[in-house]
Amino acid sequence: MAPGGGRGSKTAGYGNSDFVVVANRLPVDQERLPDGSTAWKRSPGGLVTALEPLLRRQRGAWVGWPGIVDEDVDHEDDPIVQDDLELRPVKLSADDVAEYYEGFSNATLWPLYHDVIVKPIYHREWWDRYVAVNRRFAEATSRAAARGATVWVQDYQLQLVPAMLRELRPDLTIGFFLHIPFPPVELFMQLPWRTEIVKGLLGADLVGFHLTGGAQNFLFLSRRLIGANTSRGAVGMRSRYGEVELESRVVRVGAFPISIDSTALDQTARHRDIRRRAREIRAELGNPRKVLLGVDRLDYTKGIDVRLKAFSELLAEGRAKRDDTVLVQLATPSRERVDSYQQLRNDIERQVGHINGEYGEVGHPVVHYLHRPVPRNELIAFFVAADVMLVTPLRDGMNLVAKEYVACRSDLGGALVLSEFTGAAAELRQAYLVNPHDLEGVKDTVEAALNQSVEEGRRRMRSLRRQVLAHDVDRWARSFLDALAESGPRDG
């Protein structure tokens, strides 16, 4: 059944939530305080931003890890209610975090799904832990869900949960959405556990991807690895779903590009305090003629090095002026215990130091670099202050930062430079699209964005805003859940 208006009556052997979201993390983080007690704080991330309002309206439950290590994984804590959200914590031990999360999820699946920018590592011990933790999530979800409930499983860390949950609770309607790219078939085939992953996903009634290409790849793999009959027609965006025929049921496969709460962002960005802070930011930067901005997790997929290299060469060639152009890079710390991420941070900070050493002046660097989280309203002020937004990933499932920047520009100012290899590029066609592997092309595109006329900038931004404001996160969730509801309830 589709999510209803609240928590159902509890039935023996079932939970009491008619709608359950399952994700690697809860929408709040648990912290241990110096006195040994614990406290909760809101956790960052696009997934939380996208799903929390929907779940709150539905008064459902959220199953996820609270963010702290707990060796007593067999002891189940009672559900927690925070701001009218029922939270179902799943405990992870230090070994779970090392092998399931940092290992299989982020050193095996993440690089494989992002076109092998970094070589994936295949360890059988990591796979075994991934299976065990996915089962723990499935069991926690089974305990939370009311009879006939709708369950929405999120992302690459939990790709085995749909099949495990189907086995435990055939009465449930199960959806799965992948928030990162789904790789080309020839890359996915490298995975030693490729068949198990596909079977895991086929436990869902609906499997969703950002783009039609990911959906088509999954249909092909279902034929090749499972021997299933599948639809052969093209999958459409938010329409024309593919189908995988199993022995007793049909799994639908679709493309549902995620978005943001664009109306809320638009309203916040118009606020007088945000506008004042944006002016202050420009003043603190020395009132340059042009401000370029990058906002990313510090991740090797994001192409931060590409934009820094392009900016450095534009300065060297005199195509950007060191006395009136600055670049601000906000880099949120990410996966700091993973070797490739530690190396990336060293490389980026060395690059920033080199550029400032070559082109900056005392008290006036040309690159301003922050390696820490930035409060939400401060980030919005940076969006309002920036003349050019640089979004240059080598591969990205969607990239919500691009949409957030557009939502904040009610003044129709600014320019968006956007990698062709983001999901967002399929929708934001009036951005300055760029191939991040083509450095000369990146330089030319950034220069064009810096020098665009007011009329050209307003024309592009008006079109971008029309797209982003019309296709918001509510529409994304609605389109997925409507398609999931059409799968119908399952009788146990």
From Swiss-Prot:
Family matches, as CDD domains: GT20_TPS
Reactions performed catalytically: ADP-alpha-D-glucose + D-glucose 6-phosphate = alpha,alpha-trehalose 6-phosphate + ADP + H(+); CDP-alpha-D-glucose + D-glucose 6-phosphate = alpha,alpha-trehalose 6-phosphate + CDP + H(+); GDP-alpha-D-glucose + D-glucose 6-phosphate = alpha,alpha-trehalose 6-phosphate + GDP + H(+); TDP-alpha-D-glucose + D-glucose 6-phosphate = 5-methyl-UDP + alpha,alpha-trehalose 6-phosphate + H(+)
InterPro entries tied to this protein: Glyco_trans_20
Gene3D superfamilies: Glycogen Phosphorylase B
Enzyme Commission (EC) number: 2.4.1.15, 2.4.1.347
Binding site for D-glucose 6-phosphate: 25, 101, 155, 335
The entry's keywords: Glycosyltransferase, Transferase
GO molecular function: alpha,alpha-trehalose-phosphate synthase (GDP-forming) activity; alpha,alpha-trehalose-phosphate synthase (UDP-forming) activity; trehalose-phosphatase activity
Subunit structure: Homotetramer.
Membership in a protein family: Belongs to the glycosyltransferase 20 family.
Cited function: Probably involved in the osmoprotection via the biosynthesis of trehalose and in the production of glycogen and alpha-glucan via the TreS-Pep2 branch involved in the biosynthesis of maltose-1-phosphate (M1P). Catalyzes the transfer of glucose from UDP-glucose (UDP-Glc) to D-glucose 6-phosphate (Glc-6-P) to form trehalose-6-phosphate. Probably also able to use ADP-Glc, CDP-Glc, GDP-Glc and TDP-Glc as glucosyl donors.
Protein's name in the database: Trehalose-6-phosphate synthase
Native source species: Mycolicibacterium paratuberculosis (strain ATCC BAA-968 / K-10)
Lineage: Bacteria, Bacillati, Actinomycetota, Actinomycetes, Mycobacteriales
Underlying gene: otsA
